Amino acid sequence: MYDLPLIDNLPVIKRARFFYLYDIHGKRYLDLYLNGGRNFLGYRVQGLNRLFKQTMSRGLISPYPSVFKNQFINLVFTFFKEAGSVYIFKLEKDAKEFLLSLTGKNKFFMPWEKEEGIYEFRVGFSNIKYPMIFNIPLPDFMSVSIVVMDNLSRKIEFKDNFDAVTLSLARHTLSKLLFYKKNIDIDFNSFATPLFRIADRYMLPLYDACYHAEIFNEFLKFGYLISPNFSIPSIVPLKFSKGDLDNFKKLCFALKNKFIDGLDSDPYK
């Protein structure tokens, strides 16, 4: 998933708070990558740390039956009200292989892409299409991938065993995602610039992929972490200052002049 040469340019991070990263030298970065969307709600989701500590302190670290399983199931059907059969996987790779074998389709598409294949749901988009896959935004070590079908058989099947810690945090995250926009007073389009177009919270590059490494490094130099992978969109943060936004826009216009307006029509020359 990572473009390692680019993400390795990020200095060692000492801590993360809300939508900011702080390196060992004290420099702050506004994170527009959010670990490929796995930290979609930021680095300090309300109640998540407390829930993690409580579950761990009760010793619920094994994949045995727990109260969180039914709570998680209820949240899944609340989130996807029209869902039929639902399958829960640990790994996105396994979920995708299952969908491909089940449907006979050979590719996936995002909400902002031309419809062709299997739908990859992204939080913020109201268009629900089946069959689909949804990766709950959680850290890599406790990933949860959901496959949703629209058949008449309303059921849920766990294809892997999950420990109580993962299920409790997945349930909590789903509950936060259900209503995350209610208390947000942010115009996501404020991050629209000559370099990015906005689709809900997702920032899609308007420049050619061959410029991405240089543009990534320029943003990093000025305290912004955009997606290191050209094919994975950056994400508008839910917390930032006016100065963050103003400087981001200035940098975008400067980079447009350098990499787009200042070059001839063939980006590889």
Swiss-Prot record:
Gene3D superfamilies per UniProt: Aspartate Aminotransferase, domain 1
Family: To T.pallidum TP0678.
Name of the featured protein: Uncharacterized protein BB_0340
Species per Swiss-Prot/TrEMBL record: Borreliella burgdorferi (strain ATCC 35210 / DSM 4680 / CIP 102532 / B31)
